[in-house]
Amino acid sequence: MIIVLSPAKSLDYETPPHVSHHTQPQFADDAAALIDELRRLSPQQIATLMSISDPLARLNFQRYADWSRASTPANAKQAVLAFNGDVYEGLDARSLSPDDLDYAQRHVRVLSGLYGLLRPLDLLQPYRLEMGTRFSNARGKDLYAFWGERITHALNAELKTRVGASRVLVNCASAEYFKSVKPKLLDARVVTPVFEDWKDGRYKIISFHAKRARGLMARYVVEGRIDSPDALKDFASEGYAFDASASNDDTYVFRRRAGA
């Protein structure tokens, strides 16, 4: 079983990693090709393209200039320790043991606009490039065209090694990022957990809580060494519980009545 996550815009390069083991991104050459094209943009063009402030555009202009094809512990950090958004607060990889991270390395993947597909311990240099960015490039009109079927083929290569009930892709990514995967071409069952909170008299998806819950689900999979979709239904972190009446074979709905 493989669980896929979205990346985070917020990054942490201040906290030293608690493990030294690291790996190299599979699509580093593709990332380098994108960086070459991004370096042609001025800070003003970056601000317009990404709808970000001028200071943030200047920061990323410098990030692209500093980016190196060679990722080392001196200029990069393990992806799961560098990402710092809501999902990663739920995952809390900094508190995972080396054995947990080793399991995550085999069962967790992060979709990325720049790197395509990352393992948790792949070295990540600072960047900002959301998958939904309409960045025209040598391969097409946007990043979905750039990545094409590459991400799907990479996932299939890994899923091919799984057998039976473990040949499952658990989609804990956002719609923006999962659009880079071609489910019809996947040689696996896709299960999507959905997290809803009770608010204003009904259950609804609340973005902040749902993002955190995706990270909590990934942590549950890692710590519990979960390798079958049925075991996902026992997830009960921070008050969530599986609701069979709202779920089906492809979508597992987890609900809670109060905040964490």
From Swiss-Prot:
A matching Pfam family: H2O2_YaaD
Gene Ontology CC: cytosol
Residues that span the membrane, as ranges: none
GO annotation (BP), single: response to hydroperoxide
UniProt xrefs under InterPro entries: YaaA
Top-level lineage group: Bacteria
Family membership: Belongs to the UPF0246 family.
Protein's name in the database: UPF0246 protein BPSL1241
Organism the protein comes from: Burkholderia pseudomallei (strain K96243)
